[in-house]
Amino acid sequence: MKLTLFAAAAMALCQAQAAEPATSGDLPTVIITGSMPLPTVEQPRDALAAPVQTASAQQIARSGALDISAFLRRNLGSVVVNEVQNNPFQPDVSYRGYTASPLLGTPQGLSVYLDGMRLNQPFGDVVSWDLIPRMAIESLTLMPGSNPLFGLNTLGGALALHTKDGRGSPGTAIEARLGSDQRRGVEVEHGGSNAQGWHWYVTGNRFKEDGWRDDSPSDVRQLFGKLGWSDARTDIAATVAHADNALTGNGLQEQRLLARDYRSVYTKPDLTQNRSTLLNLTGKHQAGEALLLSGNVYYRKIDTHTFNGDLNDESLDQSVYQPGAAERAALAAAGYTGFPASGANAANTPFPKWRCIGNVLLNDEPAEKCNGMLNRSHTRQENYGFSGQFTALADLAGMRHAVTAGAAFDASHATFRQTSQFGYLNPDRSITPVDFFADGTEIDDDGTPVDNRVDLSGRMRTWSVYASDSVAFNQDLTLTVSGRYNRSTVRNRDAITPGGGSGSLDGDHRFSRFNPAIGLAYAPAKGVSAYLGYNEGSRTPTAIELGCADPDNPCRLPNAMAGDPPLKQVVTKTWEAGVRGKLADVARWSAGVFRSENHDDILFVADNQAGFGYFKNFGKTRHQGVELALDGKAGALDFGVNYTWLQATYQSREVVNGSANSSSDADAPGLEGHIVITPGNRIPLTPSHIVKAHVDVQGGRDWTVGLAMTAVSSAYARGNENNQHQAGGPAYLGSGKSGGYAVVELNGKVQLTPRLSIFAQVNNLFDRKYATAAQLGATAFDANGNFAARPLPAVNGEYPMVNATFYAAGAPRSVNVGVRYAF
């Protein structure tokens, strides 16, 4: 009997609608709809040679998650979140040690798709989670490994998001919430359809909070709309999404200052303003009983401004306290009063400013005497493209083939401009600017112009062709073979130093590669299946990585870049194997192993100055581990538990800068030095153990209560790549790692009427103090929180630094309540 695509889709739809656990407790078949970026034939999860994880809109809503990243952290196995920015909408989402982050300077290893459109941005491959409206998401699929069908940057996995439409989400709903730290938000959604085949859906969101850390407000505004038309064979939809957000995330804090005041910030502000507009036209058409055509055309524009108050680390080894005679004369002539005539030092002048102002007036050395800096950047990005594919079903020699083949094109243009203005640090950690910029007008002691300006434009083009054949030999055995060829060109042009040569960012780069994949899924018995898979993926270096690869010229990202030799593209090769099954239609279980090896991995290596570092190709790294999972439903009880053992290690020897590391080869503690990475050293920010568990109880139709726990083991700090740092002496403070932690969330919902419900959530129920990430670096403060230049005696004319561990502190306990009205 022939099975048409239309019948397959209808059957899959019925099963997908049953994917929410039935009241009888039977477990439905899980259908995967996101095995490729574009629509294709839905497949049972057991037919895929990978431990795919999925979630529905109902599951996302029940979790109480603020956004998609929060849901991933709470519910999906092998996922951890590093709160480097300490803003709920700016997390680093890490899966198996591969990251999707909004921060330039974080090596990216995950690709994210929305209705077939790649969300990784052209400049830096970053993912801005604040641009993804949670309420618009109908389902998500997390595909593991370096699956080539998801294109560039799919080194460790791919997240495919699918949005709602008016057919599946009819009606209107209004949701409002209030919470700790002045958190307040309103979401509205409306969907519908008519007999003529038209369907529509729209949702809007406004969210504001003061933030749990000092001076850390955020304002999020999101709008999403979809208009479509469909009949028995065709479905076309046009999507528009707009966001206009202002996010303050004040980043890492030094360990002693964090112990004094958990809500304190190192310096401020750290403001990111994102404005984005996305247009996406998608379509699929059943051209015959066994042929499905699908494709999309898209356009996106993103405008990002950043404004950061930072320490000028060049001042830490300078005499910045007592102004000299010429400086005092200049201050007096300019009308200043109150500056010290003599005797100013660290003890009586905890926040010096007069030498900074005096050197600006004299146009002498403000780059060394001013201890603050205001960094501003502006990034404009546009990208557009299209993709198209066909899926054909055929029976050949008694075997069912599902063949998919397609092509894609993506083009982008990005401009990045940055300026740095000097200033001085205030007691509240803000920076007062002075009239002097790092624009090359001052020459430092080495004879190099002090110039942090960047004016870079880049164009990137990527052509891709891909194909996949899933062969069902019988009901028990499925073989899938696929591959993708990518060809990318990158053209960078430097408006400040054009023409190439030393210091220029000009460059023309070309990258190409064919990435294969093969997988086998076998079901030897009812309720039990096994899989084995191998795949390869690659990513090209981004403009910011190509421009910041010199250890002698580290960058404060995204605030500085320098012309360097081009980096190589990263190639990842992944093996997967595992078994899975059901327990008496009450629970699903799975056990698997994986190994991913990155060749020419691009790593960010920390410099001794906090926030500074550089990119470099590293010979080989390895991510391997074991994953165990159990989830199910027994009566009113819904439960799940995941465990991951992860070993992310370097597999090559390398010498890198390690001045903040106690094991460096520095001539004396606190001076500049290097460390040696050897095979087997663990990669920073990757924990060895991840445990997640949740229990939800359904009290009839009226109420639900849930408890979730996430436990993560310790991880090494950036700057401690050799895993040898030890606290000791006045020059090295802190362990060089972040400790393990466990946090618990409690949420509940009460259905007051068929239309009205209330809900509440308590995050970090036991108010644990913990850190999700760490970095080694020189600190500018003493134990009392006062600025301290030249904190240690000179050694052969050089002043050692006090180096500390900086932590990304986890949010304290917070309570959020809300109400939802649907009609």
Residues covered by each model-derived region:
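A beta-strand signature from Gram-negative outer-membrane beta-barrel systems
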Residues: 33, 119-121, 130-173
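Surface-exposed extracellular loop regions of Gram-negative outer-membrane beta-barrel proteins
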Residues: 244-260, 489-496, 508, 521-575, ...
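Signature of Gram-negative outer-membrane beta-barrel scaffolds
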Residues: 373, 400-525, 642, 655, ...
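C-terminal beta-signal and adjacent terminal beta-strands/loops
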Residues: 538, 710-723, 749-823
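N-terminal periplasmic "start-of-domain" segments of outer-membrane beta-barrel proteins
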Residues: 28-63, 89-93, 110
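Gram-negative outer-membrane beta-barrel transporters
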Residues: 387-392, 474-476, 586-599, 614-721, ...
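Membrane-embedded beta-barrel scaffold of Gram-negative outer-membrane proteins
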Residues: 286, 292-298, 302-310, 523, ...
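Transmembrane beta-barrel wall of Gram-negative outer-membrane proteins
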Residues: 178-208, 213-250, 269-292, 482-484
